């Protein structure tokens, strides 16, 4: 399994402070077995830098990473890294586009799904957002099809995962709450499930009717204050060998550290038994 960790700390306008690390996990159920940082030489300040990287997926031995550019101009891109050894630079291609996205998942053939943070124009009150089915060509993200979906989860859109067998999963979390001592907290996450073949026709404010994907199930994970001060799910995947859902989590200890702040760590959680509940629309 591969994971990515953004290291911008909000310093988008200072490339020297922006970087992302890619990690390889031989066995994600072990915190020590075969865990290594890949020596891709993607360093701060270089044109090839991943900067504030969020979503990532793997297809045909290539990693596809969604990135925000640290220039304050609202530029975003997908970087394709052709995986090699851990001691060499990997060939890469950057594909730019105008929409902010934190999530990517392989769809079919050379197509991918990008989850945008852009609501359908005029339909923001209904929490309807865009899923773009895209391919990559000549340094650009090319949109082949736009699908709309209703967000029946929380306010913040996080990671996605799609497969023909399991359908589409979307991670949502409650908004972050900031504290004077620098602590950041979110108290709940909800994973939505969408059957891409099922839609509901809805009339938008432009007078036209559009097919809208409606989540059919949701998996809630509320904050357990006895275990964590904050618990933020960021990405989701399905283990193809066990059919277990696995999620990456940024969590903070419930016990404050020496500086009065709650130390944060990254976790991988595996849910071996999940009870899906029907979302109320």
Predicted ranges, named:
Residues 1-16, 52-55:
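Beta-strand-rich domains and repeat architectures in extracellular enzymes and scaffolds
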Residues 9-26, 71-80, 120-134, 177-199, ...:
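Structural motif
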Residues 18-61, 67:
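Blade-loop segments of beta-propeller domains
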Residues 47-55, 94-107, 152-161, 228-237:
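Repeated scaffold domains used in trafficking and secretory/extracellular systems
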Residues 60-61, 109-111, 165-167, 241-243:
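Short coil/turn segments that connect the beta-strands within blades of beta-propeller domains
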Residues 152-217:
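Loop/turn-rich, solvent-exposed surfaces of beta-rich toroidal or solenoidal domains
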């Amino acid at each position: 399994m591969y994971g990515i960790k953004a290291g911008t700390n909000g310093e988008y306008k200072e490339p020297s402070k922006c970087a992302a690390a890619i990690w390889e996990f031989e066995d994600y159920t072990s915190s020590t077995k075969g865990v290594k940082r890949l020596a891709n030489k993607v360093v701060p300040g270089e044109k090839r830098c991943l900067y504030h990287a969020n979503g990532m997926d793997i297809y045909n031995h290539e990693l596809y990473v969604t990135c925000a550019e640290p220039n304050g101009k609202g530029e975003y891109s997908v970087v394709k890294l052709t995986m090699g050894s851990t001691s060499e630079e990997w060939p890469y291609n950057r594909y730019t586009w105008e929409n902010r996205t934190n999530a990517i998942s392989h769809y079919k053939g050379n197509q991918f799904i990008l989850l945008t943070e852009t609501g359908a124009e005029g339909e923001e009150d209904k929490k309807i957002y865009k899923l773009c089915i895209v391919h990559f060509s000549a340094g650009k993200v090319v949109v082949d099809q736009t699908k709309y979906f209703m967000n029946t989860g929380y306010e913040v859109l996080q990671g996605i995962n799609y497969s023909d067998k399991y359908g589409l999963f979307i991670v949502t979390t409650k908004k972050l709450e900031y504290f004077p001592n620098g602590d950041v907290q979110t108290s709940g996450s909800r994973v939505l499930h969408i059957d891409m073949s099922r839609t509901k026709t809805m009339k938008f404010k432009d007078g036209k009717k559009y097919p809208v994907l409606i989540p059919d199930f949701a998996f809630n994970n509320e904050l357990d204050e006895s275990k964590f001060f904050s618990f933020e799910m960021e990405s989701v995947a399905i283990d193809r060998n066990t059919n277990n859902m696995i999620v990456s989590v940024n969590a903070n200890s419930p016990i404050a550290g020496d500086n009065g702040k709650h130390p944060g760590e990254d976790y991988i959680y595996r849910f071996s038994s999940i009870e899906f509940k029907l979302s109320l629309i």
